[in-house]
Structures are given as structure tokens and as C-alpha cells.
Amino acid sequence: GRVLSAAAVGFLYGWSGSRRHLPWINIGIAGHRERDVGELIIANKIIEQSSRRTWYPPQVVATENGSTLITADQIERDFEQNAAYDMEASGFLAAALRCSTAELVQSIKIVSDNIRQPLTSLNADRIEQLIGGQLNTIAHLADRLQQLSQSNLPELDVEHLMTELTRRWSFSVTQRHRLQRLLQRWVLLL
């Protein structure tokens, strides 16, 4: 659940070259007391049930599909609160917030079961069907996050920076080469 989700974020962050300002989306299924099976929700409040830690992901897309999402350690069947229940969002969020800005970290869930339609047999095909039914909405949010991530990145051009710095200070040829390599690395880290 949440521990494996956090580990996956760490792995993917390292695999991506530890680039900051990238969007992170947790897509999965969740049970909900009242929402219809197949309905998409965007977490606007995430509660880790075991610790009561709470996060409020910034909402970057106007939607009526917002919901509280409770991360439980075991499958929830009683739905005590009118909220969505999953098993990994809090781990994902806690880890992803170390890799990017809060507005670029979102959790999207597709309702898999509720009080009227309890979870009986869930398999990979059914999960694929539930998520597949919401791909257009998921793609819209992903596009919006990608746009936001681009607007968060400072417009850094190594040549422009080199020109500005060498205009202000004197550098030897060796120092210029070192400076250019350092600027290239710095821009990649952002």
C-alpha cells in the first residue's frame, strides 16, 4: 500500500534523473460510501487513517469531483465516513511532495465499490475497464499539470546566462569552460 507507493515514487524520481517540477499523478481505484462505481474523484483532502496526518492538495482544475480520500491499511468495507478509501495515496503524496511542488502532485481515483455495490471480485481487467472509462478526464488533468510544470520552470538559457555573467565579470578561457559546464548542469537540475 502506502509504503510501496512511496518507494515507487523514490525509484521513479531517481530514474527520471531527479528532475524537479515534474507532475506526479497517483491514479487508482477507491471505494466510496455514496459515489457511483466508475465515477472519477480528485482528492482535495488526504487523510492517513493510522496516523491522522492530513494533506490538502491544491486544486488545479475546477471540478465538482473533489472528495476526501482516506488511506487505510486494510480494505475498507464499512465506509464510516462519506469519503473515498484507498491504500496508497498518503504514501504517494508524502513522497512526491519531496520531489515537486504541491500543485503538481495530485491523486485521482476511480470508484470501484460502494455501499450499494460492494467489492466482490476485482481483477486487473475490471480495474483497466474502470480507469479506461475515465481516460479523457485523466488526460485533461495530466495536460493541465504539464502546462503548470512548464510555467513553474524558470526560462534559463545557458548562452544567455554565459553572456550576462561574462559581461559582468572577467573569466579566463578555462574558467569560461568550467562555468559553462556548471551552468549546463545547474539548468538540468532545475
Where do the language-model regions lie?
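Glycine-rich phosphate- or other oxyanion-binding loops that anchor nucleotides, phosphorylated ligands
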Residues: 1-189
